[in-house]
Amino acid sequence: MEVKFITGKHGGRRPQRAEPQRICRALWLTPWPSLILKLLSWIILSNLFLHLRATHHMTELPLRFLYIALSEMTFREQTSHQIIQQMSLSNKLEQNQLYGEVINKETDNPVISSGLTLLFAQKPQSPGWKNMSSTKRVCTILADSCRAQAHAADRGERGHFGVQILHHFIEVFNVMAVRSNPF
């Protein structure tokens, strides 16, 4: 019985091997392996580039470009950080809405009215305000337009300032809002 060997390009009795260039080309042309290989090569090259940049202390790029978040965990951390920022912003807006509800009810709580006076004390001096002390300001424009009975309770237990600020707050706020509106 005779055994015949299929001879390839190289001849001889050894089996023919595929050339490495052909294997790489075949892998590069197939869709999923090529995508995986391209992604891995990009990750390796970018990490190598960033490592070389960081070790040689080259400061041509800003510091935020020295690290590129390529992992899913870092993406989750960035997303959660953005969610936390949005939640804190919505909490601030909710607090502002609560302050607005308190103002609209015109409550006579002395704690809230002292907080409102501190808010007024932080505003810059405007022509409509008379500075009495660091925590007390009186509206001189609108005080003359009110009835005397409205301020009769000012001399009570709540002190001189409690009802007057809450009585004038909405009107004064409207005057200040018109002045600060850029449009």
Swiss-Prot record:
Domain of life: Eukaryota
The protein, known as: Putative uncharacterized protein encoded by LINC02915
Organism annotation: Homo sapiens (Human)
